[in-house]
Amino acid sequence: MSDDAMLTWDSAPERRGWSRQLLESIASARQELDRGNPEQFAPGYSGLPAPRQIKFWAELFIAIARFESNWRPHEIFHEPPPLGVDSVGLLQLSYEDEPVYRLEHLDRNVKSLEDPLVNLRCGVKIMSTLVVKDSVVASSDGGRHRGGARYWSVLRAGHHVDEIRNAAKAAVALP
């Protein structure tokens, strides 16, 4: 991988396969992701060449995963009521998401969501679904969450959205 294609977490060799999957998933969903008006979320995005736009999205997911699981694929958080589900893996997804977001088949018995490649594919699908629905990457206003902030609390105002945005922008040299 060239330095330009290297992602933040690629310093650990086992994550390079994660990066390939993430970049492939984003490239496949880019048309949907771009309907979330990433230019509004990160001014200058639209002026980036396509490979840097894909890298921007990858770094956004990597930053989300850092706050959600500290990049630990076997991380499980037991959500308190009323949710009462387990949030699993890099992006802290739940098995209950499968029918809601029309995800690939997930099998709790084989711990599908603890497989980083499955988790990343599903996370990109969830994000692309939400940004298409709301035409925004992430926003929070008076308790109303849109885009990725509907799903990931780290993308909500008062949480880590600014750190996540800044990490993704820095990775592609956006001011």
What are these regions (language model features)?
Residues 74-79:
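Short, solvent-exposed loop/turn and secondary-structure capping segments
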Residues 54-62, 88, 141-151:
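Alpha-helical scaffolds flanking conserved acidic
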